[in-house]
């Protein structure tokens, strides 16, 4: 595992706070539970209230470590409303997990309806960066911005793909990677850490039952990797095992 752990001051987990965006299910929900279990204060968002299930149930069982908020990151007004609500808070980590896959990833791009492709690109690439820009000043000076991406967005690794599937999803994640690098260029002198994180092929609604990585393994790997880079002030593209990935 790659690591940049140095002699940086260690802040007790109990004093750390994370804004976790897109935590209603799957990886986002798993991360909310993991950070809370490690003693963090978690502000976790979902598009719609989950009632007594999902994130709401996790919050109820977390002894005050998880607080829920509503936001649709595709809705600029909703993003601004949340930004106003949280304006007095400061976060050690902002982790944007929200994303979507193509309804049928076996289709090549020319068979995907325009409105479907636009939805994937907006939610996977455009909206995460717009959200990051709106909330970046709520990160503490040594804070970390993490965004969930995929190795499928790597231009280098595309040659290792077994087939041509997931074309729209791959392209949207490549766009996210590029926009995040541009974001880093704008903010590189501010000292914060910016991480793009690949969770592995995980058994979730998106990953399916054939995925080789279980949710707990991915989530704990993401947590450990993020903590090892937190406070470094660097930018990196990493997988859940801490390996640096090629762009």
At which residue positions do the language-model features occur?
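Short, flexible catalytic-loop segment of classical short-chain dehydrogenase/reductase
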Residues: 199-205
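N-terminal Rossmann NAD(P)H-binding glycine-rich loop of SDR-like oxidoreductase domains
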Residues: 24, 28-33
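Catalytic loop of short-chain dehydrogenase/reductase
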Residues: 100-121, 126-129, 144-188
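Rossmann-fold cofactor-recognition segment
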Residues: 59-77
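Conserved Rossmann-fold cofactor-binding substructure of NAD(P)-dependent oxidoreductases
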Residues: 73-89
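Rossmann-fold scaffold of SDR-type NAD(P)-dependent oxidoreductases
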Residues: 21, 91-99, 124, 147, ...
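C-terminal helical subdomain
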Residues: 189, 196-197, 208-247
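Conserved glycine-rich Rossmann-like NAD(P)H-binding loop of the short-chain dehydrogenase/reductase
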Residues: 38-54
């Amino acid at each position: 595992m790659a690591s940049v752990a140095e002699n940086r001051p260690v802040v007790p987990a109990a004093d750390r706070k994370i804004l976790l965006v897109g935590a209603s299910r799957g990886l986002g929900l798993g991360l909310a539970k993991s950070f809370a279990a490690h003693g963090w204060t978690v502000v976790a968002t979902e598009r719609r209230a989950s009632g007594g299930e999902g994130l709401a149930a996790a919050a109820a069982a977390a002894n005050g470590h998880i607080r829920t908020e509503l936001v649709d990151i595709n809705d600029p007004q909703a993003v601004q409303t949340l930004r106003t609500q949280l304006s007095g808070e400061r976060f050690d980590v902002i982790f944007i997990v929200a994303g979507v896959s193509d309804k049928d990833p076996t289709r090549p791009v020319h068979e995907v309806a325009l409105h479907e492709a636009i939805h994937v690109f907006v939610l996977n690439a455009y909206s995460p960066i717009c959200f990051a820009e709106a909330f970046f000043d709520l990160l503490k000076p040594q804070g970390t911005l993490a965004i969930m991406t995929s190795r499928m967005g790597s231009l280098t690794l595309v040659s290792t793909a077994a087939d041509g599937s997931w074309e729209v999803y791959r392209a949207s994640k490549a766009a996210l990677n590029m926009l995040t690098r541009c974001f880093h260029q704008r903010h590189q002198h501010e000292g914060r850490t910016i991480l793009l994180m690949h969770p592995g092929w995980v058994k979730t609604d998106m990953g399916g039952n054939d995925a080789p990585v279980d949710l707990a393994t991915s989530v704990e790997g993401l947590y450990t990797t993020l903590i090892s880079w937190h406070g470094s002030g660097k930018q990196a593209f990493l997988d859940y095992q801490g390996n640096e990935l090629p762009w």
